[in-house]
Every structure is written in structure tokens, then in C-alpha cells.
Amino acid sequence: GINTLKKVIQGLHEVIKLVSNHA
């Protein structure tokens, strides 16, 4: 549902933050 989608999006944002910090 929508809650699961929100969790997935939050996870993607966390990954992007980590990648940006390493880059």
C-alpha cells in the first residue's frame, strides 16, 4: 500500500544520501 511505498522512498533517499556523501 501507500505506507510501503513511503518506506521504500525513504530507503531510496537514505541510499542517495550515502552515495552522495561518498561521491
Curated annotation (Swiss-Prot):
- Chief location category: secreted
> Keyword annotations for this protein?
Amphibian defense peptide, Antibiotic, Antimicrobial, Fungicide, Immunity, Innate immunity, Secreted
BP terms from Gene Ontology: defense response to bacterium; defense response to fungus; innate immune response; killing of cells of another organism; xenobiotic metabolic process
Subcellular location(s) per record:
Secreted
By its UniProt entry, which InterPro entries does this protein fall under? Antimicrobial_19
Q: Which GO terms describe its cellular component?
A: extracellular region
Tissue expression, per UniProt? Answer: Expressed by the skin glands.
Show the Pfam families listed in the entry.
Antimicrobial19
Q: What does this protein do?
A: Possesses antifungal activity against C.albicans and is also active against E.coli and S.aureus.
Give the family from UniProt.
Belongs to the frog skin active peptide (FSAP) family. Pseudin subfamily.
* Name of this protein: Pseudin-4
Q: Provide the species name.
A: Pseudis paradoxa (Paradoxical frog)
Q: What is the lineage of its organism?
A: Eukaryota, Metazoa, Chordata, Craniata, Vertebrata
